[in-house]
A protein has these predicted regions:
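Aromatic-lined carbohydrate-binding/catalytic grooves of carbohydrate-active enzymes
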Residues: 193-350, 389
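Beta-rich accessory regions
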Residues: 529-531, 549, 605-797
C-alpha cells in the first residue's frame, strides 16, 4: 500500500526482558506490565498488531526462581507463579504486591477480571445503560488486555490474521497507580494524537434533508443570535438517496444530490468562509452502485463489469478496494472542500477475513488517509476496540432522548479513560425516540460543555430539532449560554488537547485517578476532573417540583473549592448534596485554579479557530496555582516536532500576586501583543484600590473594574506577549463569606412554597444564631427533605 498507510511501530521487545520456554514466552515490559504468550509450536509474534505497536520498553528489573514445579518471577510490583505448561487457572497466577486487598489481588489465568471498566462500541438504540468492556485499571490492582485475536500489521501497511490457538495477554498490575497504568498503555499501544482546534468548538448535526439555501439560512440565524459553531455535520441527504430500487436502498451514496446542493464546492466554500469545517456522513456497506458518478472508474479499477452495472462490493478486507475507495470516492469530495468523514458503519464486526472488524479497517485507514496532505487528521466513527484512541473522534451512536440516557453518559465517558479513549462525541440532546423535555435538553447541552466534544444532534422528525429557539425561554437561554461558553473555553480545551497527547491524560479524568485510596472517589459515578483545573458533576435528573432546583451528589476532596457559576465557596473533605437551578450545573475550580478562556466578544468560528488576541483569565484565591497555556498552528502535525509556544501563569496566595511569564517557543504562532482580562474571583470592593500592575518590572496603569454583584475584580492589561506581567493585590481583599442570607433569600423568593414557611425559615437564618443551631431548629420543623437539603448546602458550604 501507499506510504501514507504505513504506521510507525517498534514492536520487538528487549531480549533481556524475556523469559522463554519451549512453548511460552513471558516478557517483563515493566515491573507491572507483563506479556504472556503461549504457542504449541513455540513460535511467538514480534510484529505489531492492530492494538499493540510498541514493545521496545527499557530493561526491567526482575529475578527468576526455578524449582521442580516451574518458575517464579519477582518484580517490585508482582509475583508470578507458572508451571511452564499450557496456560491454566491452576498453573499460572500473578499476585499484586502491596496488600491491596485480603484475597482479591491475585489473578489466576482464565478468571473473570473485575476492573473499573472501559467503554463500548456504541450507544445505538440505547435507553440508559449498556454493558461496558474492560479497562486497564482496577481497585483489585490488575486487569488484562487480551491481544490473542487482533490482526497483524504488516510492513507494507496492510494486515493479516493471527495464527489461531495462541494466547497473547498483557497483564497490567499497577495496583492503584492508575495514571502509570494508563501511561504505559499508551506507551504500548500508541499515543492519542491532537485534534485540530476547530474540533473543540460546537458542532451542528442533524439527520435532516437540508439544501444549500436552507442550511445557510440556518447558519445566518445562528449568527444573528450569536450562537457559534465550528463544525457542520451533513448527514446522509448530501448524497442521492431516492435511487432506482435496482441500485439498492440509497443508504450508501457518494454522488451529491444536486437538487439540494447544486454547487457543492460553493456550499463548502461558504462554510469555510465562516471559519467552519465540514464532515459528510457515509455508510460504506452497500458498496458502489451503477448510479454513482464515479462508478465506472471504480468498477474498472476493481475489474467489475461496468457495462452490466454490476455493483462494486464493499470489501474492506481487500487492500485494492480500500485504495480505490479513497481514490475515487473520497479524494474528489475532499478536493471540493470536505474536511473529514463521518464513517457510519452499522453492519457488525464480520467480513471476509475471520476476526477482522470492518469498523477498525475503516477507522484506521480513514485516519491515515486524512493526513496525506500534511494536515492534522481526524475521523469520526464508532469505537472498534482497544487502540481506537489513535483514531479520534468517537461517535457514540443514536441514543434515545431520555433522562436515563443522559444520566449514563457522564459515567460512560469517564470509564472510557480507563482504556485510553478520551474523545467521545455524543449526540448532545439525544438522537431519537424518547420525548420532548425542555429541561432535559438544557441539562444535556450544559453537560456538552464539559464533555469531550459538543455536538448537537437529532433525528429527521420535524419536531426534533435542537435549535435553541424551539424551546421555552429559560431553556433557550440556558442552551445559548452553554454554546457560547464552550467556545469561550477553547484556549483551555486546546491546552488539555495537548496534555492528552504529551502527558497521556485524557480531558476526562475519573476522580479515583487523583484519589485512589478514597472510597468516595468511586461512589460519584458522574463526577470527574475536566482537565487540570476543573471538577464537574453534571445535572442528570429533573428539578424538584416547587423548589425549581435539581439535586446532585458531589464529593469535595480536601481543600477549598469554588463553583465557577455561582461563586459559592466549599470546604472539602466531604460528600454533599448540591442544588442548582436551570442556569448552571455544579462545576468547581480548586483554590489556586487558573482558567484561561477566550473573550466573550470573540466567539465566532473565525475567531476561535486561531490563537486569540484577547484572553480572559480567571484566578481563584486562597492557594498557590499554576497553568501553562499551550498554542501551536492549530492544524498541522508540527506539534509532534515541538513547534509550539507556551505561556506560563502562576498565582501566589501568600503574596496575592499573579504572574504571566513571557511566551516561550515559536512566538510567530501567536499575536505580538495581547489584551489580558484578568478576573480575580471572590474579592471585596477594596481590591480595586489595592491592585498594582507591572509590565517587565515597570508599574503601569491598568483598567480596573469591580463587579459588585459577582464580587470579581477585573484588571485589563495590554502588553507584548514577550513581556512579563505581574498583578499584586492584597490577600485581605479575598471575600471568604458565602453571603448566606442573600443566597437563602434568593432561593426562598423563587421557591413555590408557603409564605408563612418562607418567613419562618428566613427569620431563623437571619437570627444571628450559630449555624449548628439554625440547622437543628430547621430540622425540628420537619421540613421537606429536599428543602432542608438546599438550606443545608448554603449554610454549611
Amino acid at each position: 500500500m501507499q506510504e501514507i498507510y504505513r504506521v510507525k511501530t517498534s514492536p520487538v521487545a528487549l531480549s533481556d526482558n524475556m523469559i522463554i520456554g519451549e512453548k511460552y514466552r513471558i516478557t517483563l515490559l515493566t515491573e507491572a506490565l507483563v506479556r504472556l504468550e503461549y504457542s504449541e509450536d513455540g513460535v511467538f509474534e514480534d510484529r505489531a498488531t492492530q492494538t499493540v505497536l510498541f514493545r521496545d520498553f527499557p530493561k526491567t528489573d526482575y529475578h527468576v526462581v526455578r524449582n521442580a514445579d516451574g518458575i517464579e518471577v519477582h518484580t517490585s510490583m508482582l509475583h508470578l507463579i507458572y508451571n511452564e505448561k499450557e496456560f491454566s487457572s491452576h498453573g499460572l497466577s500473578i499476585q499484586i504486591k502491596g496488600n491491596l486487598s485480603a484475597y482479591h489481588s491475585i489473578w489466576h489465568y482464565g478468571e473473570k477480571v473485575h476492573d473499573l471498566q472501559g467503554t463500548a462500541r456504541t450507544l445505538d438504540d440505547v435507553n440508559g445503560e449498556v454493558e461496558l468492556g474492560h479497562g486497564v485499571v482496577s481497585r483489585f490492582g490488575y486487569s488484562i488486555l487480551d491481544d490473542s485475536k487482533s490482526q497483524i500489521l504488516l510492513d507494507d501497511g496492510w494486515i493479516e490474521p493471527r495464527k489461531k490457538g495462541v494466547s497473547d495477554l498483557y497483564f497490567f498490575g499497577y495496583g492503584h497507580d492508575y495514571k502509570q497504568a494508563l501511561n504505559d498503555f499508551y506507551r504500548l499501544c500508541g499515543k492519542t494524537p491532537m485534534l485540530p482546534r476547530y474540533a473543540l468548538g460546537n458542532w451542528w448535526s442533524r439527520y435532516y434533508k437540508y439544501s444549500e439555501e436552507s442550511y445557510m439560512e440556518l447558519m445566518d440565524k445562528f449568527d444573528e443570535k450569536n450562537i457559534p459553531f465550528t463544525v457542520a455535520v451533513i448527514d446522509m441527504d448530501w448524497h442521492q438517496v431516492d435511487v432506482d430500487p435496482k441500485y439498492g436502498s440509497g443508504w450508501t451514496g457518494y454522488t451529491w444530490n444536486k437538487k439540494l446542493f447544486p454547487d457543492p464546492k460553493r456550499f463548502l466554500g461558504k462554510l469555510h468562509d465562516r471559519g467552519m469545517h465540514t464532515t459528510l456522513n457515509v455508510h460504506p456497506a452497500d458498496g458502489v452502485q451503477g448510479c454513482e458518478e464515479m462508478y465506472v472508474d471504480m468498477a474498472k479499477e476493481m475489474g467489475v463489469d461496468y457495462e452490466n452495472e454490476d455493483p462494486v462490493v464493499c470489501d474492506p478486507a481487500s487492500p485494492k478496494f480500500m485504495e480505490a475507495y479513497f481514490k475515487y470516492l473520497h479524494h474528489p469530495r475532499e478536493a471540493e472542500g470536505v474536511d473529514f468523514w463521518w464513517i457510519d458503519w452499522q453492519q457488525g464486526s464480520n467480513c471476509k477475513v475471520e476476526g477482522l472488524d470492518p469498523l477498525w479497517i475503516f477507522n484506521h485507514f480513514h485516519y491515515l488517509d486524512n493526513k496525506r496532505d500534511g494536515r492534522r487528521p481526524m475521523t469520526f466513527s464508532r469505537y472498534a476496540g482497544p487502540g481506537s484512541h489513535r483514531y479520534p473522534i468517537g461517535f457514540s451512536g443514536d441514543t434515545h432522548i431520555t433522562w436515563e440516557s443522559l444520566d449514563f453518559q457522564p459515567y460512560f465517558t469517564t470509564t472510557a479513560t480507563n482504556i485510553g479513549y478520551g474523545w467521545w462525541s455524543h449526540d448532545i440532546g439525544g438522537h431519537m425516540l424518547g420525548y420532548k423535555d425542555d429541561e432535559l435538553t438544557a441539562r444535556w447541552t450544559q453537560y456538552g460543555i464539559f464533555s469531550p466534544i459538543m455536538r448537537l444532534h437529532s433525528s429527521c422528525s420535524e419536531f426534533n430539532g435542537k435549535e435553541p429557539w424551539r424551546f421555552k425561554k429559560e431553556t433557550e437561554e440556558a442552551m445559548e449560554a452553554a454554546l457560547r461558553q464552550r467556545h469561550c473555553m477553547i484556549p483551555y480545551l486546546y491546552t488539555m488537547n495537548y496534555r492528552s497527547y504529551a502527558e497521556n491524560m485524557p480531558l476526562i479524568e475519573p476522580m479515583y485517578y487523583e484519589y485512589p485510596e478514597n472510597a468516595e472517589a468511586y461512589e460519584v459515578k458522574n463526577q470527574y476532573f475536566f482537565g487540570s483545573q476543573l471538577m464537574a458533576a453534571p445535572v442528570t435528573t429533573p428539578r424538584i417540583k416547587g423548589l425549581n432546583v435539581a439535586k446532585t451528589k458531589v464529593w469535595f476532596p480536601e481543600g477549598i473549592w469554588y463553583d465557577i457559576y455561582t461563586g459559592m465557596r466549599y470546604d472539602g473533605g466531604r460528600m454533599l448534596e448540591v442544588y442548582r437551578d436551570l442556569s448552571s450545573i455544579p462545576v468547581f475550580a480548586k483554590a489556586g485554579g487558573i482558567l484561561v478562556c477566550a473573550d466573550a466578544d470573540e466567539l465566532d468560528a473565525r475567531s476561535v479557530i486561531k490563537n486569540p488576541d484577547v484572553l480572559c483569565v480567571r484566578v481563584f484565591p486562597e492557594a498557590d496555582g499554576e497553568f501553562e497555556l499551550y498554542e501551536d498552528d492549530n492544524e498541522s502535525c508540527g506539534y509532534v516536532d515541538g513547534r509550539c509556544v507556551t505561556t506560563a501563569m502562576k498565582y501566589s496566595a501568600d503574596k496575592d500576586m499573579f504572574v504571566i511569564s513571557p511566551a516561550d517557543g515559536d512566538t510567530s504562532l501567536i499575536p505580538d501583543n495581547r489584551t489580558y482580562k484578568l478576573v480575580f474571583e471572590r474579592r471585596t470592593e477594596a481590591a480595586a484600590d489595592k491592585v498594582k500592575v507591572s509590565v517587565d518590572g515597570k508599574e503601569v496603569l491598568a483598567k480596573n473594574k469591580y463587579d459588585k454583584e459577582n464580587r470579581k475584580l477585573i484588571v485589563t492589561v495590554n502588553a507584548s506577549t514577550a513581556s512579563k506581567i505581574s498583578v499584586a493585590i492584597s490577600k485581605d481583599t479575598v471575600a471568604l463569606d458565602n453571603q448566606i442570607e442573600k443566597r437563602c433569600f434568593d432561593f426562598l423568593n423563587q421557591a413555590e412554597i408557603g409564605f408563612v414557611l418562607k418567613d419562618e425559615i428566613y427569620g431563623l437564618i437571619t437570627s444571628g444564631k450559630k449555624t449548628i443551631v439554625i440547622l437543628s431548629e430547621l430540622k425540628a420543623k420537619e421540613l421537606d427533605t429536599e428543602l432542608y437539603g438546599v438550606l443545608t448546602e448554603i449554610l454549611t458550604a
